[in-house]
C-alpha cells in the first residue's frame, strides 16, 4: 500500500521557504500568514519545485537618513527547489591554500575525538572513463557535465553577448586544468522552447538582471555539506552597478581617456565594464575567494606597456578589487581592454589547483600529488594569495605595503 502525507501547511510556513528571515533587510514587514498559498508544484525524478505566493505588510519605520515610507501590502512570488543529493559525493579537496571558499565539518571515527576538516567549494567536473587516458596524457577533454549559465531574458539585449563573453573568459583557466568547453552561457529558454525551465530550479545556474538602485553584483556558492560540491548558482547583477563603474572609470582613467568625462559612456566601454563585473562574480561562483595580492606584482612601466598588458592584464587576478588601470598617463596608448582587470595567471592557477584531476590510485594519493604540484607552482610569487578576510578590517600597522585593497 501507500501513504499520503499532508505537507501543505509545512511548505507554506517553514521559515526557510518564506522571506521571513530576510524581511528586515528587504524592508517588507510582516507576513500575512492567512494569505499564503501554493500556486504550483512540479515533481521530477530528483527534485520538487514549489511556486508559492506570500503577502507582506510593511509598517512605517523611521530609518536614519531616509524618509518615512508609508505602509503598504506587497505580493511576493517565491520559488523553492528541494533536490536529492547525489548518491556518490564529489571527491573532496582539502582547503589548505585559502584561495577557495570552504566549508568545515566534524569528522568522527570510532571512539576517537572529532577532527575538524575544511574542504573547498567547487563544481563537479568529471571525465568519461574512455577519456581518462587522453586526459592524463595532457589532452583537453570535455567534462561529462559542463557548467552552463542561463541568462535572464530581462537583461538588456545589448549586454547579452558581453555577458556570454564574460563567462567564456574562464575557459582558458579550465583548459589549464585539462577541460575543453567546461563553461558557457546562453539566453534562458522561453516557455515554448523548454516548458520545464524555471529560474528557481537549482539545476540551472542563472544570471539575473535586477532593476535596482543598488550599485553592486553578487555571486554566491551554495554547496552540499558532504564534499563542498557547488549545487546551485544564482548570480545577481544590479543594473545600477554601471553607475559605480562609471565613477571608477572617471576617477581612475579620466586622465588618459576623454571618454570618461561623458555623462553617458559609449557602449563599447560599458561592455568592458559589464564583463569586468560579471567575470569577477563568476569567479566567486566557481569557488574563488578574493585575492588582494593580485594587483601587487607589476611595475608602473609594465602597467603602461600595451603589449605587456595584452598578455598579462593589469594584475594577476580578477578576484582582487582592483578595477581600472590608473597608472596610465595622458600620452599612453593602450587598448580599451587593457584599462581594466581580466582573468590573470593566478586565476588560471587557482582553477587548475581546484579542478584538475590528479593521478593516483585513491583520493589520498591524488591529494598528495596535488600538493606536490602546488609546491612547485608556489615558487612563482604572482601565484601567491592573501585574503586577509577583508583588508579593510586589518590595521595598517599589520599590512605589508603590497597588500592593499582596490589598489595597484
At which residue positions do the language-model features occur?
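Auxiliary tRNA-acceptor-end handling modules of aminoacyl-tRNA synthetases
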Residues: 1-155, 173, 188-245, 249-267, ...
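The catalytic-center signature of Zn2+-dependent metalloproteases
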Residues: 187-210, 272-328
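Short, solvent-exposed loop/turn and secondary-structure capping segments
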Residues: 160-163, 173, 219-221, 234-235, ...
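Stable alpha-helical elements in mature extracytoplasmic
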Residues: 159, 163-166, 270, 274, ...
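Conserved catalytic/binding loops enriched for acidic/polar residues
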Residues: 295-297, 301-400
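Polar, glycine-rich mid-to-C-terminal structural blocks
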Residues: 238-268, 277, 336-364
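Single conserved hydrophobic/aromatic residue that forms the stacking wall/gate
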Residues: 398-401, 405-408
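Zn2+-dependent metallopeptidase catalytic core
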Residues: 156-182
